[in-house]
Amino acid sequence: DNGDLFGTASAYHDHFRSGGRNGCVERYGPGGELLWRVRIGGENYLSHHDVVLLENGNFLAIVWDRVSSDEAIEQGRDPETVAEIGEFWYDGIIEVDPYELEIVWEWSARHHLVQDLDPVKRNYGGVAEHPELIDINTIHRNMRGKITADWTHLNSIDYNPELEQILVSSPHLDEIWIIDHITTPWESMGHAGGRYGKGGDLLYRWGNPANYDRGTEDDQQLFGQHDAQWIPEGLPGAGNILVFNNGGRKRPYSTITEITPPLNADGSYVIDASRAYGPAQPAWEYDPDPPERFFSWFISGVQRLPNGNTLVNQGAGAKLREVTVDGDIVWEYGYQGAGDVPHMLFRANKYPPDHPGILMHTN
């Protein structure tokens, strides 16, 4: 709100060849002056896609952690489903103090795995019995049908300060995950402790219950989604989760999906002993008729507005629209890009003229 600009910047590392790589986070003041720059990357480690600023001035970033296929196999990955390049990329989250250049908290998917392939491994167990863990043998294939090293490809991150929880989106597994942020370094690697008593295990997941053997392909509700977020307090639908539900090979159209997570009073999530996490159906969807007229197979974003409408960023083609709860379009804009750059938008946000950050630039 003070007029600063905060976000990622490109410091590419050629050994991570996947969409969304950045390797740098920056903050600029209202006059365009660089306040700080943090580079996050190396031969086997790189920040990518998204960041979120915390109230304490630190930020959360998504990072890749690259290991060999052999190491993934040691963790229970099926040798028949490793990428041809001989690598396996775990996703993680770090909290960084940009002034001390220090990682003050971290989490990695590599510590929260289950598999039912090799009974000798420590993480062997029934996948359906452990919805709080990630089956290392869930697989993603790219548009050419190849299994990729970029396993989960987290593409967005959000933080809920009231619940002290982190929300991330895995389009490769067609799921959103929520984890506890109030854990010690040991607790974040384990299965106990923290505010919710589950350490760094998943508190909640939604979108594709087949990933934890509590559903089938017919139960899938997210398809390559982007920009998962909690609707902020004070806005219509506050506390719900909103996401751009892209679609793809399984579904050649997009929707905007809003869900009401099954939240207990203490901030934990309801789940039946043998069923998938709810809800069974979205609380609201924007799904134009015919559906094929609204489709972006990659990037894209969404934002709930104070008037109850929703700003939709159709990333492929760079089309913005504001839609009502009834699906009526009340405003549209087509971004033309610059020069020969293809027309695409990763994300867009709308700010009112009296937003404090804008007033900082005009007064």
Placement of each model-derived feature along the sequence:
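Histidine-/acidic-rich catalytic cores in large beta-rich domains
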Residues: 1-363
